[in-house]
């Protein structure tokens, strides 16, 4: 009985993936379509959005990061889907 209970606990932990994984937007446009999310790698606990002007366009990069880059036009956040 104890073996069965232990097996169920292990299977539950594996199936639920108790390790938290961050999800960030990855599109390179001003607005993103629904579902354009990336599951970040282990250790990447921030989402970021970097924008800058190039010629007559605004360029945007979004993604995951292990640290928050301290640049002028970078927005960082630490919740899922927050780098709008």
Swiss-Prot record:
Keywords carried by this UniProt record: Acetylcholine receptor inhibiting toxin, Disulfide bond, Ion channel impairing toxin, Neurotoxin, Postsynaptic neurotoxin, Secreted, Signal, Toxin
Signal peptide feature range: 1-21
Gene Ontology CC terms, in alphabetical order: extracellular region
Pfam family of the protein (one): Toxin_cobra-type
SUPFAM superfamilies: Snake toxin-like
Tissue: Expressed by the venom gland.
Function field: Binds and inhibits muscular and neuronal nicotinic acetylcholine receptors (nAChR).
Protein name: Neurotoxin BM10-1-like
Source organism of the structure: Bungarus multicinctus (Many-banded krait)
The organism's taxonomic lineage, starting at the top: Eukaryota, Metazoa, Chordata, Craniata, Vertebrata
């Amino acid at each position: 009985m104890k073996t069965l209970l232990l097996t169920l606990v292990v299977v539950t932990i594996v199936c639920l993936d108790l390790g938290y994984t961050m999800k960030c937007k990855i599109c390179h446009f001003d607005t993103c379509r629904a579902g354009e999310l990336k599951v970040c790698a282990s250790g990447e606990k921030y989402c970021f959005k970097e924008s800058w002007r190039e010629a007559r366009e605004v360029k945007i990069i979004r993604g995951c990061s292990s640290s928050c880059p301290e640049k002028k036009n970078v927005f960082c956040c630490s919740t899922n889907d927050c780098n709008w």
